[in-house]
A protein has these predicted regions:
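Contiguous surface segments at macromolecular interaction interfaces
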Residues: 1-5, 10, 24-30, 70-134
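Short, polar loop/linker segments at the starts of domains and inter-domain junctions
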Residues: 15-24
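A generic "cationic amphipathic patch" detector
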Residues: 19, 51-54, 76, 99
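Short, well-ordered loop/turn sites that connect or cap secondary structure elements
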Residues: 35-36
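Amphipathic alpha-helical interaction surfaces
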Residues: 44, 68-71
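Short, charged beta-turn/beta-strand-edge "cap" motif at the junction between a beta-strand
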Residues: 45-50
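Short beta-strand-centered aromatic/proline hotspots
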Residues: 52-68
Length: 134
């Protein structure tokens, strides 16, 4: 089992939670293919909207990958992003970036946020998960 962070606006994360899916890196297939059934994904949201909105700077969702299927979904005539099915946990408390900064591995992960999708340790994932589920 592996643990991942996806970066997306809170609005987009909430659409995924409601629909039971994840998308990362503007719908690219390759990052999704690295995840396997049973892996966990934490979503970090810098803002409420994709190109605008208020600062969020928090982990806003956590879920487990359902199967090994990566599929395309037609959102618009010229936009068919790739998705994975996810069972999201009912995580009542978004985890602010300040809590993530308390973890010793945060410095190395902070630099990777700009990539939109990256692997993290079980320990870091648990640090965030415990806060979200408290």
């Amino acid at each position: 089992m592996r643990y991942w962070v996806g970066v997306a606006s809170r609005d987009h994360v909430l659409l995924g939670v409601a629909g039971g899916f994840c998308q990362v890196c503007h719908g690219k297939q390759a990052p999704l293919a690295r995840m396997k059934q049973g892996d966990w994904i934490l979503y970090y949201s810098p803002k409420t909207g994709m190109n605008s909105g208020e600062k969020v700077q928090a982990f806003t969702a956590v879920g487990q990958i359902v199967d090994d299927r990566v599929y395309q979904f037609r959102m618009a005539e010229n936009f068919e992003p790739f998705r994975r099915d996810v069972v999201f946990q009912d995580a009542p408390h978004p985890c602010p970036i300040e809590v993530a900064r308390e973890h010793p591995e945060w410095r190395s992960y902070a630099k990777q946020l700009r990539y939109g999708h990256f692997e993290v340790s079980h320990d870091f994932s648990e640090h965030i998960y415990r806060y979200m589920m408290r």
